[in-house]
Amino acid sequence: MTRHFLRDDDLSPAEQVEVLDLAAKLKRDRFSARPLAGPQTVAVMFDKTSTRTRLSFATGIADLGGNPLIIQAGESQVGAKESLADTARVMERMLAAIVWRTFAHSGLEELVDGTRIPVVNALSDDVHPCQTLADLQTVRERKGRTAGLTMSFFGDGASNMAHSSLLGGVTAGMRVRIAAPAGYTPDPRFVADAEAIAARTGGSVLVTADPGEAAAGADVIVTDTWVSMGKEDEKAERIAVFGDYAVNAGTLRLADPAAIFLHCLPAYRGLEVSAYVIDGPQSVVWDEAENRLHAQKALLTWLLAKNREDAV
């Protein structure tokens, strides 16, 4: 059966470790894996604009010996004049894998149903699993482990980053806290899934409206923009609602003294995070951004290897 990566929990805890171990290896020896030599082509499709996702996937695919085919919104008929399943059947005849940054998660699921090559979710409205892999790689670099650590997310608990922090964090054995106001809490489906995983890994889940409760003793502090793509018309309302959830010096005072700060970027200083935090010594956001490259290379290498094993 073809392996895909649409959600963080598409990797078991042991598989997540395999990918993160490989990511560390590829960071040390950038060109040691060449699974796309030929070169084979990987389509990288964007329905949403991107900087880090395009940079990291295009560079990573080239590092792996492949050819990145960048398809921007409006440059193809994906999802327009034929079913995604039909498009997928054509794509699998020419490509080694498909990477898609899109809106509705259901589109990814439909694409998967029609293809026998790996599909990677480069971001959907539901989750952002490639980012969380990079986050976990960064945590391992700075803390030496993930299991038993507390990771606290502040802000829009219904966002894709909050959902992926939940799923990816508990898969890694972390205690995950989400601090969010009423009306912006995580989708109950993701909370239930995360709790089920945590019961097996020793992690835990806490959803709270109290940012102080989430910050207390935390090892990893995470936030994201308050105004995601597609939410621009809610900007004023969101800034007012999330004001108490800004990450600032007070947040760090409550956290563990050795806590690190993560943000997937772009960041808006003075809104979700203060300049004191993101530009300070506890911020690891630039390492985190670089690790998108290494984590995604490891993921693609792992998926291609698994699918070749299954084909034998």
UniProtKB/Swiss-Prot annotation:
It holds the Pfam family OTCace. One of its GO terms (molecular function) is ornithine carbamoyltransferase activity. Its main location: cytoplasm. It catalyses: carbamoyl phosphate + L-ornithine = L-citrulline + phosphate + H(+). Keywords: Amino-acid biosynthesis, Arginine biosynthesis, Cytoplasm, Transferase. This is Ornithine carbamoyltransferase. The lineage of its organism: Bacteria, Bacillati, Actinomycetota, Actinomycetes, Micrococcales. It is found in: Cytoplasm. Signal peptide: none annotated. Belongs to the aspartate/ornithine carbamoyltransferase superfamily. OTCase family. Carbamoyl phosphate binds at S50, T51, R52, T53, Q77, R101, H128, P129, C130, Q131, C264, L265, R292. Reversibly catalyzes the transfer of the carbamoyl group from carbamoyl phosphate (CP) to the N(epsilon) atom of ornithine (ORN) to produce L-citrulline. It is an enzyme of class 2 (transferase). Pathway: Amino-acid biosynthesis; L-arginine biosynthesis; L-arginine from L-ornithine and carbamoyl phosphate: step 1/3. GO terms for biological process: arginine biosynthetic process via ornithine; citrulline biosynthetic process; L-arginine biosynthetic process. GO terms for cellular component: cytoplasm.
